């Protein structure tokens, strides 16, 4: 990643930053305008490829190198980085960082964040299983299996202490056996 250059992504294609002023003047002399959409290592996905069967409400929110499975919706505040994406129909209203895989029928709620390989996840690929819900403004730094819900505003990261309970709100251990309160606390991993 550090070896990639930041480029000016323009209506005339990518331009090295050191050449930008020259190209701007040349374009002006030709009677045209040079429009710079952004300066970054990656362009927007939709400027080069639009995956079949997806909805991307704001093209600037999905970088080239992201993978979107058919049926995925990325809302205006949603964001998907390069080397990240969705396997099938998913709703993305939050941030999906580099190196993250989100499975089908999962909703990344508004303002939710999934920590990736560039934001503290290191080389661990974080995956979110099928039919999961990350509530508004929640976040994770660990992988989740199928059917998980992270409450709005809650951030779960590796090493965070988590209390386990069953459907009756009784304290349980990792095997699901009812235990005394306090014996149901584990570290997320």
Please tell me what each predicted stretch does.
Residues 12-28, 110-118, 138, 146, ...:
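Short, Lys/Arg-enriched charge-dense amphipathic segments
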Residues 21-32, 99, 105, 117-122, ...:
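Short, surface-exposed, charge-dense and proline/glycine-enriched linear segments
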Residues 1-47, 185-189:
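Terminal amphipathic alpha-helical/low-complexity segments used for targeting or macromolecular assembly
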Residues 54, 60-62, 66-68, 72-74, ...:
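A structural motif detector for beta-strand N-caps
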Residues 121-125, 130-133, 158-189:
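C-terminal segments of enzyme domains that contribute to small-molecule binding surfaces
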Residues 45-54, 123-125:
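Short, positively charged
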Residues 46-49, 59-63:
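A mid-sequence, solvent-exposed acidic-amphipathic segment
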